[in-house]
Amino acid sequence: WFYQPYNIHAPAVMFDRTNHIDNYPDYFADSVAITSVKSTLLTDIYQEELNTPAYVSLEMKVDMDAATRQLSIDISGEKVLPIADEDSVRINVWLTEDSLYTEEQRGVSGGYYHRHSLRRCLTSTWGDKIDVSQPFSLHLTTELPANWREERMNAVAFVACRDAEDKNSCRVLNACQERVAMMPL
């Protein structure tokens, strides 16, 4: 959905689901929020996003019961800056895993280790609607399959706007991540 139908490429990058065409028209010429990782301006775009304030606070606590592989996630936050369309705000919670090895990866010869690979979406695809007119909280639980390496996993939460008609109106308002389990010594 974020790509143009004729231009799907990897590797690619997206910063906060934001189209930077006003400042970087040559790199966002398709009016989408995605550009190639070969862009020479990635550092500039990254710095611009680092300077963008968070519109909501976001805190997350992750607990895992190693015996049952049951994961418990508690998230809380509140609006800290005005948001144009508060009715469109949603929270997304994902589980990711690092160091997933594959021998086949287009554009790479030999093996390749994937980082931040999406393992499970704990909310609906486009996030669960939240009311940011007051402090919000969310409690989620899930069981990790035995073949997932919890020491390589993160819980990622982000709050974003959602506009089903305009892909450039889905800005991320804040994000956080926590490790699922500590690496063994």
Task: Give short role names for the model-derived ranges.
Residues 1-185:
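Short, conserved sequence motifs used for protein processing/export or organelle targeting and
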